[in-house]
Amino acid sequence: ILPGQLHHILLRGNNDQPVFVDDEDRQAFRQILGEAARQQGATLHAWLLLPNRVHLLVTPREERALAAVMQTLGRQYVRCFNTRHQRSGTLWEGRFRASLIEGARFGLVCQQYLERLPVAMGQAPTPAHYLWSSARHHLGLEHELGLQPQPAYWALGNTPFEREAAWQTRLAEEALAQALAEVHPHLA
């Protein structure tokens, strides 16, 4: 883990089991994630919640920041999930996986991959329709406190409208194949 560098984080459900049963679980996770990132010194750039896994793009400000964020999630979210669903035991498949993302262009390709993945998996017709990712923020449909776009995202245009339109184009179907080919082999 390198401070000041973009990382892709992957958390998988133990034995591919669901880690979210309903929207209340997803909302609780988002709240805990936002607070943990803020308190532990990590900048959250993009996120995706799928039924059995979580993808994050995060820049830690200190060496231990990512581990501290994940530890907070492990303690608080798992306790919340287990209590709500009257279960016990582990929720996650071992330790989180982290991959260093080098280069601004590659960071945007990773974000494109994450925000387009629900469409590729048949979870939504477009990224804008999937409520549990950062795509709606980057497309200008919602404003999410605590989410800070990567510097390369800011370079997509001079105004929010230009950036959002450029991002919409990047999330278009034609761009997906290239993004998948570039990113998939390198993610955790």
Please place each PLM-identified region on the residue numbering:
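A generic structural motif
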Residues: 54-56
